[in-house]
Amino acid sequence: SCGAWEACFYDGASTRVDTRELLQALTQEDNRFRVTFGAENCGIAGNTNAALTMATGEFVALCDHDDLLAPDAVRCILEAAQDGADFVYTDEDKVSADGTHFFEPHLKPDFAPDSLRSGNYICHITAASRALMNAVGGLRPGFDGSQAHDLALRLSENATKITHIPRILYHW
């Protein structure tokens, strides 16, 4: 529902031919898909940071390989950014492998620092202004496995305006 987006992929030396072929096909079909094929797997933080360096937008959102966004997710996030948010998160749920059944909704509270310090209720989808992401240094190597929580803590500590969109816009 929004044409102003790009998807940046960093392939961390995947040995799967079908993955490489799919990524190459995406870039040929639509120039909003950008791919770099890395010579090595740099871990979750390193691979994500490599993808972040490819992004040209003023706002960036982090997604995993198995994520599905609602059709209006990008538009909703951009509207929050236009309203002054520099850190945005949404509600989420899980989706069946065939993409037909949605279950286990995670309806999150508005920003609650003490709750975030206790555990990562924010998870995905997380989006931030490029300026804020750059200010906190992106994801930190050495935090793979808890990288999303570490990033959410640092983004929230440095954000000017945090916005929770109380809609399920992210499925995994």
Regions found by a protein language model. Name each.
Residues 44, 63, 68-73, 94, ...:
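Hydrophobic/aromatic residue at the end of a short beta strand that borders the catalytic acidic motif
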Residues 38-55:
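Glycine-rich, basic loop-to-helix element that forms the pyrophosphate-binding segment
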Residues 68, 72-102, 131, 172:
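Conserved donor NDP-sugar-binding/catalytic core segment of glycosyltransferases
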Residues 2-37:
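Acidic donor-binding segment of Leloir-type glycosyltransferases
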Residues 60:
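Short aromatic/hydrophobic "clamp" motif used to bind/position activated sugar donors
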Residues 10-14, 42, 65:
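Conserved short acidic donor-positioning loop in nucleotide-sugar-dependent glycosyltransferases
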Residues 45, 53, 95, 101-131:
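A recurrent flexible, glycine/aromatic-enriched loop bordering the glycosyltransferase active site
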Residues 113-172:
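Conserved nucleotide-sugar donor-binding catalytic segment
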